[in-house]
């Protein structure tokens, strides 16, 4: 990682494999996550080269997409070449996030993922063969509970 405002290189760190995607936590501006080709996801403090904040094996195949909800603090989504999308609660105790919900979207390997800008529990993912799938996770009790907790309810 390099801070473009400085002439010298910033903090660098290794992931578990080739990095597929990175995302900033919109509620903790110095935290970023990276998903890698092994299915691992690692969180780091951007200004420190120390040990990761946490890491986990999120998927059985490449963690091809990672993104944070911009409306529900601590809600992370990951998508994978294993065709699944998983939601994680990063807002709790230190250490790896707790799993919240998972869904196989039945569109093959997944390559892109995003939260809806208005509804914090609706996600869209793009898969192999040009397929796009929507998942309204509000019907999943774990996802709904995580969102309510993020809202302080």
Question: Over which residues does each language-model region extend?
Answer:
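Loop/turn segments within WD40 beta-propeller blades
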Residues: 23-29, 66-73, 79, 114-120
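Short loop/turn segments that connect beta-strands within beta-propeller blades
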Residues: 4-7, 46-49, 90-93, 138-140
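A conserved positional marker within WD40/Gbeta-like beta-propeller blades
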Residues: 31, 40-42, 84-86, 131
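Detector for outer-membrane/organellar transmembrane beta-barrel domains
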Residues: 40-44, 49, 53-55
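Terminal intrinsically disordered, low-complexity extensions flanking WD-repeat/beta-propeller proteins
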Residues: 62, 72, 84, 90-153
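Conserved strand-to-loop turn within each blade of WD40 beta-propeller repeats
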Residues: 4, 35-38, 78-82, 126-129
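WD40/WD-repeat beta-propeller blade N-cap
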Residues: 6, 13-19, 49, 56-63, ...
């Amino acid at each position: 990682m390099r801070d473009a405002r400085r002439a010298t290189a910033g903090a660098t760190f290794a992931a578990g494999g080739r990095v597929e995607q990175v995302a900033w936590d919109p509620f903790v501006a110095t935290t970023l996550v990276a998903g890698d080709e092994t299915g691992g996801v690692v969180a780091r403090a951007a200004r420190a080269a120390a040990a990761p904040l946490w890491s986990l094996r999120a998927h059985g195949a490449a963690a091809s997409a990672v993104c944070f909800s911009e409306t529900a603090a601590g809600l992370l989504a990951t998508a994978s070449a294993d065709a699944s999308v998983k939601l994680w609660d990063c807002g709790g105790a230190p250490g790896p996030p707790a799993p919240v919900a998972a869904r196989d979207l039945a569109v093959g390997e997944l390559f892109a993922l995003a939260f809806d800008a208005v509804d914090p529990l609706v996600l869209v993912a793009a898969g192999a063969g040009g397929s796009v799938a929507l998942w309204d996770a509000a019907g999943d009790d774990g996802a709904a509970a995580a969102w309510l907790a993020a809202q302080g309810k």
